[in-house]
């Protein structure tokens, strides 16, 4: 029997993401971002989750203030270090590394020795910050000042792959602190970044925003390596990476899904699909069959498209309001999930014959990996009523847990699957 636990917060949490790694026990890490109307009161946090038979306990391990509403959030691993990457309504992309995880939340492969390098650096430079507890350390930040390409800049706060040369650390820190002050003075009001996505190889990330511009940034230093100013005449709502070179977007003009190839010499999309959706808020790409795209719209529709064609291959009118997020399951990519402003989360199973019922608990040898729209099963996930809009969700298949958040109820909900 599945369990549901509700955890109330003093903050309006609007983004939640798991770190998808194997942990030693029934634990996991997830991160959150907020959308407080007073922009200076927003923050990102890292949490620990302990999975139990009848309930789940969460614990906020560390947090840092963020200037602006958090519009998107990812957590990945770089050089054996968990890294939070996020975007804001004030036009910044930020990267924070997570240091000194409590022992019970250390995952397989986590290298805690990297933390000592920063402790040594602080001792040499007489910095009083302690790292006895879990902390978030700013690594890099980039400001979207795309109205003037010369103003697009990045601030690499800790680079050189954790250089052991302490003199280099000292020089780099002084230079970067000066750059940081200049950046903060000149770029606090960049164009809002509505969405970003990370390439499959984790070498780059792509951003879109209110300015209708697409930027491809190197994750190593957050320096733009490709810019296209002709994505849309208005704001772009969502972007997803198909491959390191292929990207899809949808914007305020609505109804259109555009496909881009940065290897092309043209600034125009290589393909455009006109949908029946009034406005698309969310996109998802099938992990194994990357020609299958899911789109969630403002009228509650969740439609599937095969980009080899110009029409939808499946339509679902399950929600009655904005579909904020979509995600294919990482463990069973033939399962799609959607969350909406109407307060519901749906699962769409496209497994051939739906062996094992299509649930998350299906054993690997019971899953038929064939994607089949004719074997679709749609189910509503049971959540507490009167929660309000479900703004974001994520699934950790290692512990069979779904986590979601609601800004209207200011809560996090953890559900076993």
Curated annotation (Swiss-Prot):
One Pfam family per UniProt: WD40
Single GO biological process annotation from the record: mRNA transport
Gene3D superfamilies per UniProt: YVTN repeat-like/Quinoprotein amine dehydrogenase (2.130.10.10)
Major location (coarse): nucleus
A GO cellular component entry from the record: nuclear pore outer ring
WD repeats: 13-57, 68-106, 188-227, 231-270, 275-315, 318-358
Keywords in alphabetical order: Membrane, mRNA transport, Nuclear pore complex, Nucleus, Protein transport, Repeat, Translocation, Transport, WD repeat
Keyword GTP-binding: no
Database matches in InterPro entries: WD40/YVTN_repeat-like_dom_sf, WD40_repeat_dom_sf, WD40_rpt
UniProt keyword Membrane, yes or no: yes
Region Disordered: start-end pairs: 152-188
SMART domains assigned to the protein according to its UniProt record, in alphabetical order: WD40 (SM00320)
Subcellular location: Nucleus, Nuclear pore complex; Nucleus membrane
Entry similarity comment: Belongs to the NUP43 family.
Function in brief: Component of the nuclear pore complex, a complex required for the trafficking across the nuclear membrane.
Description of how the protein assembles with itself and partners: Component of the nuclear pore complex (NPC).
Protein name per Swiss-Prot or TrEMBL: Nuclear pore complex protein nup43
Organism: Dictyostelium discoideum (Social amoeba)
């Amino acid at each position: 029997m599945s369990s549901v636990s509700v955890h109330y917060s003093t903050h309006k949490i609007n983004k939640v993401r798991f770190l998808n790694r194997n942990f030693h026990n029934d634990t996991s890490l997830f991160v959150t971002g907020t959308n407080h109307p007073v922009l200076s009161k927003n923050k990102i946090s890292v949490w620990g989750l302990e999975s139990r038979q009848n309930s789940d306990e969460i614990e906020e391990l560390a947090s840092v203030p963020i200037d602006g509403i958090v519009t998107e959030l990812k957590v990945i691993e770089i050089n054996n270090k968990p890294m939070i990457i996020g975007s804001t309504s004030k036009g910044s992309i930020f990267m924070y590394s997570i240091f000194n995880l409590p022992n019970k939340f250390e995952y397989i492969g986590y290298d805690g020795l990297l933390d000592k390098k920063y402790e040594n650096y602080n001792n040499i430079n007489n910095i009083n910050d302690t790292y006895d507890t879990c902390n978030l350390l700013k690594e890099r930040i980039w400001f979207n000042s795309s109205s003037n390409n010369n103003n697009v800049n990045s601030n690499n706060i800790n680079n050189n792959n954790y250089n052991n040369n302490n003199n280099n650390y000292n020089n780099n820190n002084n230079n970067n602190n000066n750059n940081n002050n200049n950046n903060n003075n000149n770029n606090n009001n960049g164009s809002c970044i509505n969405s970003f996505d990370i390439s499959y190889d984790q070498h780059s990330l792509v951003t879109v925003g209110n300015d209708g511009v697409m930027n491809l940034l190197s994750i190593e230093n957050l320096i733009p390596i490709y810019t296209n100013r002709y994505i849309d005449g208005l704001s772009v709502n969502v972007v997803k990476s198909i491959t390191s070179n292929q990207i899809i977007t949808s914007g305020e003009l609505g109804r259109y899904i555009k496909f881009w190839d940065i290897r092309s010499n043209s600034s125009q999309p290589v393909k455009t699909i006109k949908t029946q959706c009034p406005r698309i808020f969310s996109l998802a790409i099938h992990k194994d069959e990357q020609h299958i795209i899911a789109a969630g719209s403002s009228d509650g529709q969740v439609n599937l498209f095969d980009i080899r064609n110009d029409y939808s291959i499946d339509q679902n009118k399950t929600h009655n309001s904005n579909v904020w997020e979509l995600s294919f399951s990482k463990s069973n990519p033939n399962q799609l999930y959607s969350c909406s402003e109407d307060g519901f989360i749906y699962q769409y199973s496209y497994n051939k014959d739906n062996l094992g019922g299509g649930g998350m608990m299906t054993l690997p040898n019971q899953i038929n990996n064939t994607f089949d729209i004719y074997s679709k099963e749609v189910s509503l996930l049971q959540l507490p009523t009167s929660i309000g809009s479900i703004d974001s969700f994520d699934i950790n298949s290692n512990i069979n847990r779904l986590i979601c958040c609601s800004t209207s109820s200011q809560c996090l909900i953890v559900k076993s699957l």
